[in-house]
Regions:
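Short catalytic/metal-binding and nucleic-acid-binding patches
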Residues: 1-190
């Protein structure tokens, strides 16, 4: 089971400010204007290390092939156990994303918390994707630590995360479909 929210599509205005970003599973076209939305992803601490056999991303170099020795090197250096999110924790994350988006006046198109990562599709006019991601992560961390002692005094998430600009309604539909279904149906992940 996956905790999800889906909101109907209502286009926002555009203004200057985004660059091209490419995901292995989705290629998004950038038009130089403020994006229609951000596709934001972050992972649970230790669950997706550099060298991972599922491929991994290297800053400014994109997708990288598996490197088992590198992945093992990172695993050996983890300072905390790797935790996965159970259903109540995933629901708490999705609810907090929805709460924060409403509070900030951001449009939440979709939020899904999986056992080892989180996806959110958000329109936040006037904000950088990294800032939106960081605010979502910080608030989700607070909620998890308030409700579950296991998350206190340890990192909950991997440092950083990913954000991609979504500029067209077609891209928005593809991203929402990916977040909703492609994790379970990899044939849609093309």
């Amino acid at each position: 089971p996956v905790a999800m929210f889906y909101y109907s599509y209502q286009p926002q205005g555009v203004s200057p400010g985004c660059r091209t970003r490419i995901l292995r599973h989705l290629e998004l076209q950038m038009n130089g204007d403020e994006p229609l939305a951000f596709f934001i992803t972050w992972t649970v601490y230790g669950s997706f290390l550099q060298g991972d056999n599922r491929w991994w991303r290297k800053r400014q170099q994109g997708e990288q092939p598996p490197q088992p020795k590198l992945a093992q090197w990172h695993r050996d250096r983890l300072n905390h156990l790797v935790l996965i999110l159970d259903e109540p924790q995933r629901l708490a994350v999705v609810n907090e994303i929805a709460r924060l988006c409403e509070y900030r006046g951001w449009q939440l198109w979709k939020a899904v918390a999986r056992t080892n990562h989180v996806h959110a599709v958000v329109t936040a006019t006037g904000y950088a994707g990294s800032r939106v991601r960081d605010q979502l992560k910080a608030n989700c961390t607070r909620v998890l630590r308030e409700q579950w002692a296991i998350f206190v005094d340890r990192p909950v998430w991997t440092t950083g995360g990913d954000w991609q600009c979504v500029n067209t309604e077609e891209e928005l539909d593809r991203v929402i479909l990916y977040v909703s279904e492609a994790q379970d149906r990899k044939e849609l992940d093309a």
